[in-house]
Design a protein with these regions (language model features):
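Conserved alpha/beta-domain cores
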Residues: 1-153
Length: 153
């Protein structure tokens, strides 16, 4: 009513945060109603592992030392679990509706290894803390160059 009364229009997009494994596994059911899906990788990692991010600092170093995990999953995205959930969501949603924009928000948006995975998955954007933006931009450019080089072979 207000926009009609004022003669103004507000452009907006409808999207969803994908922060739980259940959301990723149900992406196809949301796809027809959204224009974007943004993966909240911090919470998605926490929910996938069942770790509290607040407590993980106490035991992640031991897991790394014992080689139970390759990387701190709150720094570098775990592609085999969290990444697989993301891949499933993108594939399932894309089958239902073309043109959805996919991205991530979270600290993984500033990690070069994670950014390469996001590029390979075909995500449209990453969002991260301001101090990580320079690293994210360089990593995204490198991922793009590496993908182009691989295509030319």
């Amino acid at each position: 009513e207000v926009t009609a009364e004022m003669g103004a229009s507000v452009r907006y997009k409808i999207g969803t945060m994908m922060e739980t494994p259940r959301a990723c596994l149900g992406a196809d059911r949301m796809a027809s109603d959204v224009e974007f899906m943004s993966f909240g990788t911090n919470d998605l990692t926490q929910m996938t592992y069942g770790f509290s991010r607040d407590d993980a600092g106490r035991f992640i170093p031991q897991y790394l030392n014992k080689k139970l995990i390759e990387h701190d999953p709150f720094v570098t995205l775990d592609q085999r679990a969290v990444g697989r959930l993301m891949e499933t969501a993108v594939e399932d949603a894309s089958r239902v509706k073309k043109g959805i924009k996919y991205g991530i928000c979270g600290e993984h948006g500033g990690d070069p290894r994670s950014i390469r995975f996001f590029h390979d998955l075909g995500l449209d954007y990453v969002s991260c803390s301001p101090y990580r933006v320079p690293v994210a931009r360089v990593a995204a450019a490198q991922a793009n160059v590496m993908a182009q080089t691989a295509t030319q072979r």
